[in-house]
Every structure is written in structure tokens, then in C-alpha cells.
């Protein structure tokens, strides 16, 4: 499409949008995406304090509260949208100090994120702050703070360092040195030993370091990948997960079965280990990691709790540390996430979508399976990241269709926000659209879920523009409310902005995403093996086009990462159906995308697979692309290489497609600065107003 013809169409659509019924005080994207995002909730080992990170329009700070009802307080004082993340909140053993990491991790060149292009550079460092708000300060360059009663262990550039007094300016010293990249530090209960993982690239070991003897003991080293160490309560044994090495393991391809993974229990003194449990062959033989600080929980009664999807759903199971048959703890269709043991080690808290497939609620179950799980939260909200204080109070992070993520205390059937004043006065909660769940069937019979947003001034039969949002991942799920991921928290605000500007908006949970079981997640032919998830997008587009309230000539796409891939697929595979797109850091050639995560990937080793990967990519059919597109990318993206967007833009230029660009120097994949999100979404809203006639 020529620039002149595109401009003419845009002018007509803009005029039509201006002639539409006026809607008073449409919230700005600044108001909608100005909702704060709470994350990283943790409970102190003693007392009733909880802590979390609050990102308020790019300004990140640590907050604490007495879970029993005390007033929440901000205990750090960062003031700018600097793009420096705060993660790894960790209490000291006496619960008086909070450690955290400020700044992102390095890329393969060793560069840490510097999204403001600060001439002085940036760093990733461990910080500490007293719970009374005193002694806020940098401790040392590094990450993964792991305090003991006598000092602080942490990781710097793949090695473990030690600081006896984190409150002074003394230099940290290497605790020990080992080949590879060390991480996942875990003190034994008596703090005499430190378990850690040692990643050697093709394999990984679990080691135990004994400071008094200055000795490393490797636990049954093998050619496989070991990790996820969990100490026994007596401090003599370490449980860990072993996943078998496979030479030609590929990414972005379905993996329904493989060589079974196992749980081993090792002697911390001798390094000898025995197998406590091994997955059965077939479904569940491939390890499926869940959202949790540790995949293994060594609990009371010498029971080890772990995730397994033997029946096609990620569930929790329990097995004796001595070995035996595993007991299913969480039966039913649905997935478990954010798993944590209660302080007494007798129960497990987790969130799940069982019984409410497009939301999350918290449940609790006994580690021995002696009783069925009990609901801790329910209703039309979304709850995740549960913790329990030493006094037994349960605290969660929660949201709903109209309320963004906040930390709340569970009080019977109610949830009480701990910091309600953090919601901005101009946040337009009452004006937000409540999405509804929808399903539709693709041409090959696969049923796909989504959430539909109808504009507040909706009139039956009045044809409107429509927009489909495509999440990234692809191991993600959009929900019936504000998402529990910061990336999709922003995306939900954008979808609300589009609906409030007159568009019918559909969030599509296409195959290969989470939430709907293993068979849906590991869909045959998805990704680099055929791109079958595009069938779900095609079905969604035709479903919208057939609706009496949608103008079939004004259906647009937007998405980031994997969602950018599907946006590009739609504009190449169905140019008559989709009329515009916003492609944010999208994958455009699977061979490039795979090599980003597997640097030694060689397409020549399997030419047929490489050819299929390219055939499954938008660039293979780019000559069919006709619609205008806005591409957005940060050039320090570590997940999708910047060259992916460069290659696409070059191809589209050659064939005269109208392309608009927005590039953020030094920004990474999930934008670190609020200004970047605002810039991206402001540009996207303007682009859609000019191409499909949404209100500006």
C-alpha cells in the first residue's frame, strides 16, 4: 500500500471516528497505565511483617506492613523512572533487615540494562534497608542475597561472595571459586553449609559448600542437569531435581514426552545420593517448571512436595524422602502456581485456576494429602503469590477487572488491601470495561479461550473497529482482569484504552499458552514446527468479522514478542482479513529466535527442521503483506534480537508497505521505564486512530 493511499484511508477513518458519538472524559493511557503494580510479596521469618515491591509509574520502592492490620509504609525513597528493577526481596534471619537487588542482570556481553542511557553507566547491586526505614544503602555489586546470622552470601558474575557485615563499607570476598555459573544459594537450617547450583552450560551440578572446612561436596554428579536444591529439616540431606541431557532438544516445539526426570536425595557430607522418585514414561516425563521460589518443598513428616503433570495438568504431589509412591494433592482440571510451604511445614499454599479457568484463586492443602484442598480465596477477583506470616495470617496479591494489583490480607471471606492509598486519585476504576469469557473453535477443532471487551457506549448492531491482542511467551495466559505479570498488567491497560475508544477488543489465549493443560500447551505443530497456533488467530478473526457489531474491514492486531510473531503472521497469512498491526519486538524467523536462546544452534545440522522453522515464520510469506504496521523495539532486547525487526522493516520497504517505527535505545524486552510503555502505547493508539478509526 502506498503512503498516499494509506494517508487517504486514514483521513476518512479519522473523520468517521470524530463523527462518532462523543464520550466524555475518556481516560488517558497515562491514567490507565498509571495504576501501580505490586510484586515480589514475601513474609518475614518471625513476627507478622510482609514486604513487597511497588512500581508506581516507573518509580520502584519497597513497602512493608504488619499483616495483622498495621499501616503500610514505603521504606525506600527512590524517586525517578530510572528503569532500575527491584527484585529478590529477602529478610534477614532476625526479620530486622530487608535485602534486595536493584538493577537488571547482564546480557551475554556482560552489559547490565541502562535504559536511560546514563553516561555513568548502570549496575546490578545488592542493597539493604532496615524495617524502620533506616540504613538504606548499597551493599555490593551482585545479586541473589542469601543472609545468615553471621553474614551475607551473594552472587557476583557467577561466583559466590561473602560479606561478614553488610552494614559497613568492607569489601566482599570470594566465598569459594568453582567453574561455571553458581546460583540458587540455600543455607542449611543450622547455616553450617550452603547448597548451590553450578551451571556448566551443557549440564549442571548441585554442590554443598562447608565454610568451616572450606570444602565443596558435589552431589552424585552426572552428565545431566541438576538443580532446585531443598534442605531436609535436620540439615543432613539435600533433595534436588535431575533432568536428563538430550542432544537435539529444540525450542518452540511441542515436547509431550521424553526421558523421565527424577528427584534425588543426597547426603550433604558424602555426596552420595539415591533416587527418591522418578516420573513415569509418557505424559509428565518432561519436567514442567511452575512459578515458585523452589520446585521442591521439603516439608514436615519427611515429605517432599513437587509439581508433576501426569494427568495432563500441572499438579502438586507428595512423596516420602525415603522413596515410594507419590500422592496427588491437587486433583482436578487446572494448574498450580506460586507454591510455598506454611511456616510449620505441614501445609502448602498455592494459587490455581481450577474451577475458574481464566482467573486465579488461592488454596491450601496438607502435605500428606490427608484432606482435600481448601479454598482460601474465591469470587470474581484474581489472587496469587500467597504467603503466611509466622502468626498464621495469609496475605496475597490480588486484582480484579477494575482493580489493579494490590497486596491484601485475607480476613475470612474478605480481602483487606494493606496499602489502598497507593492507587492514584485519577485512576478511573469505575469507567473500566469488565471483560467476559468467550470461546471459539479453530478449523482443526481446537477450542480456544479469550476475553472480550465491549465499548461502554456499545450499541447492538453498530459496526465498530476490532482489535485482537496476542500475548507473548508463548507460555502465558490473559485473564478476566488485571494480569499478575507486569508486562501484561501494562497490556491490560492498553486493551482497556482501546475499548474505551470504541473498539471491540479480544484478548486471545491461543494454543501453546498455559492455563488449559499440557495437550493445549504442547500443541502439535506449534511454533517452529508448523505455526498451528495461527489457526486460532484466524478463527478469532473470522469470529469477529462475523459479528454484527464489528466492521470486517477494520480488524487490527497487536502484540509483543510471540504476540508480535502472530501479529506478523496475521498480516502475511490473511491480508484480506487483518487491516493493520502493531508489532512489538516480534519474532519473524524462528531460526533466528531459536539461536537467541541456543547460541550453538546450527540449522545445517537438521536442514529439514530449519526449513520447516522458516516456513512457520512470517518472513516466509512476507510478500503477501499489504497492511500498514507500526513496529516497536528496544535495541538492548535480550529475548528477541533487534535484527528481527530490522530484517522485517527492510523486507516491507522493498515492497512498498507503509511502516512506522518506534525504537528505544538501550531498552530491553520487557520495557524497564514507564516512559517507554507510555511512548509505545501512545504511538499505538495514534496509529490505530489513523488506520482503523478508533477514537484518538
Model regions: which residues?
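Short loop/turn segments that connect beta-strands within beta-propeller blades
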Residues: 66-70, 130-134, 165-168, 210-214, ...
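A flexible loop/linker signature enriched in serine peptidases of the S9 family
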Residues: 53-63, 78-85, 101-127, 138-146, ...
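Bacterial N-terminal signal peptides
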Residues: 7-16
Amino acid at each position: 500500500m502506498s503512503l498516499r493511499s494509506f494517508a487517504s484511508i486514514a483521513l476518512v477513518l479519522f473523520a468517521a471516528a470524530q463523527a462518532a458519538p462523543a464520550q466524555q472524559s475518556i481516560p488517558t493511557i497515562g491514567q490507565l497505565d498509571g495504576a501501580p503494580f505490586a510484586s515480589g510479596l514475601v513474609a518475614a521469618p518471625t513476627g507478622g511483617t510482609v514486604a513487597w515491591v511497588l512500581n508506581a509509574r516507573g518509580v520502584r520502592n519497597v513497602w512493608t506492613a504488619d499483616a495483622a492490620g498495621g499501616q503500610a509504609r514505603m521504606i525506600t525513597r527512590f524517586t525517578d523512572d530510572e528503569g532500575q528493577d527491584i527484585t529478590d526481596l529477602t529478610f534477614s534471619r532476625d526479620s530486622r533487615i530487608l535485602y534486595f537487588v536493584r538493577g537488571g542482570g547482564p546480557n551475554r556481553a556482560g552489559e547490565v540494562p541502562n535504559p536511560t542511557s546514563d553516561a555513568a553507566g548502570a549496575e546490578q547491586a545488592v542493597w539493604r534497608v532496615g524495617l524502620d526505614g533506616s540504613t538504606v544503602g548499597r551493599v555490593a555489586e551482585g545479586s541473589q542475597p542469601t543472609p545468615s546470622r553471621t553474614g551475607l552470601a551473594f552472587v557476583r558474575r557467577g561466583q559466590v561472595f561473602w560479606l561478614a557485615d553488610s552494614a559497613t563499607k568492607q569489601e566482599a570476598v570470594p566465598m569459594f571459586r568453582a567453574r561455571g555459573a553458581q546460583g540458587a544459594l540455600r543455607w542449611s537450617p543450622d547455616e553450617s553449609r550452603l547448597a548451590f547450583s553450578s551451571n556448566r552450560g551443557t549440564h549442571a551440578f548441585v554442590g554443598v559448600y562447608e565454610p568451616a572446612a572450606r570444602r565443596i561436596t558435589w552431589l552424585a554428579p552426572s552428565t545431566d542437569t541438576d538443580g532446585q536444591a531443598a534442605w531436609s529439616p535436620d540439615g543432613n540431606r539435600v533433595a534436588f531435581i535431575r533432568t536428563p541431557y538430550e542432544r537435539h532438544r529444540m525450542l518452540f516445539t511441542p515436547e509431550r514426552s521424553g526421558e523421565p526426570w527424577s528427584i534425588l536425595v543426597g547426603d550433604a557430607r558424602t555426596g552420595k545420593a539415591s533416587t527418591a522418585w522418578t516420573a513415569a514414561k509418557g505424559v509428565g516425563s518432561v519436567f514442567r517448571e511452575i512459578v515458585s521460589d523452589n520446585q521442591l518443598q521439603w516439608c514436615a513428616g519427611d515429605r517432599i512436595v513437587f509439581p508433576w503433570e501426569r494427568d495432563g495438568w500441572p499438579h502438586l504431589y507428595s512423596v516420602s524422602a525415603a522413596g515410594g509412591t507419590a500422592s496427588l494433592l491437587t486433583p482436578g482440571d487446572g494448574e498450580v502456581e506460586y507454591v510455598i510451604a506454611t511456616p510449620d511445614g505441614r501445609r502448602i499454599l498455592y494459587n490455581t485456576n481450577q474451577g475458574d479457568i481464566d482467573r486465579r484463586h488461592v488454596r491450601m492443602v496438607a502435605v500428606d494429602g490427608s484432606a482435600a484442598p481448601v479454598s482460601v480465596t474465591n469470587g470474581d477477583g484474581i489472587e496469587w503469590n500467597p504467603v503466611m506470616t509466622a502468626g498464621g495470617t495469609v496475605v496475597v496479591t490480588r486484582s480484579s477487572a477494575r482493580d489493579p494489583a494490590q497486596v491484601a490480607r485475607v480476613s475470612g471471606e474478605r480481602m483487606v488491601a494493606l496499602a489502598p492509598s497507593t492507587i492514584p486519585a485519577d485512576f478511573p476504576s469505575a469507567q473500566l470495561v469488565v471483560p467476559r469469557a468467550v470461546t471459539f473453535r479453530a478449523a482443526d477443532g481446537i477450542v480456544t479461550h479469550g476475553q472480550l471487551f465491549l465499548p461502554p457506549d456499545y450499541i447492538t448492531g453498530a459496526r465498530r473497529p476490532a482489535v485482537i491482542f496476542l500475548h507473548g511467551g508463548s507460555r502465558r495466559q490473559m485473564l478476566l482482569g488485571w494480569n499478575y505479570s507486569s508486562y501484561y498488567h501494562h497490556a491490560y491497560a492498553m486493551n482497556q484504552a482501546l475499548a474505551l475508544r470504541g473498539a471491540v477488543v479480544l484478548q486471545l489465549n491461543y494454543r501453546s499458552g498455559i492455563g488449559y493443560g499440557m495437550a493445549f500447551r504442547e500443541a502439535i505443530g506449534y511454533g517452529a514446527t508448523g505455526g498451528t497456533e495461527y489457526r486460532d488467530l484466524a478463527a478469532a478473526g473470522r469470529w469477529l468479522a462475523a459479528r454484527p457489531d464489528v466492521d470486517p474491514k477494520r480488524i487490527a492486531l497487536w502484540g509483543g514478542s510471540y504476540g508480535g510473531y502472530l501479529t506478523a503472521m496475521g498480516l502475511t497469512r490473511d491480508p484480506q482479513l487483518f487491516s493493520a498491526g502493531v508489532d512489538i519486538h516480534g519474532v519473524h524467523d524462528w531460526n533466528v529466535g531459536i539461536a537467541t536462546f541456543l547460541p550453538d544452534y546450527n540449522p545445517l545440522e537438521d536442514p529439514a527442521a530449519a526449513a520447516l522453522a522458516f516456513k512457520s515464520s512470517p518472513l516466509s510469506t512476507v510478500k503477501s503483506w499489504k497492511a500498514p504496521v507500526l513496529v516497536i523495539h528496544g535495541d538492548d532486547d535480550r529475548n528477541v534480537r533487534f535484527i528481527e525487526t530490522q530484517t522485517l522493516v527492510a523486507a516491507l520497504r522493498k515492497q512498498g508497505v507503509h511502516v512506522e517505527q518506534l525504537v528505544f535505545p538501550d531498552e530491553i524486552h520487557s520495557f524497564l521505564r514507564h516512559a517507554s510503555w507510555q511512548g509505545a502505547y501512545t504511538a499505538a493508539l495514534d496509529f490505530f486512530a489513523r488506520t482503523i478509526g478508533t477514537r484518538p
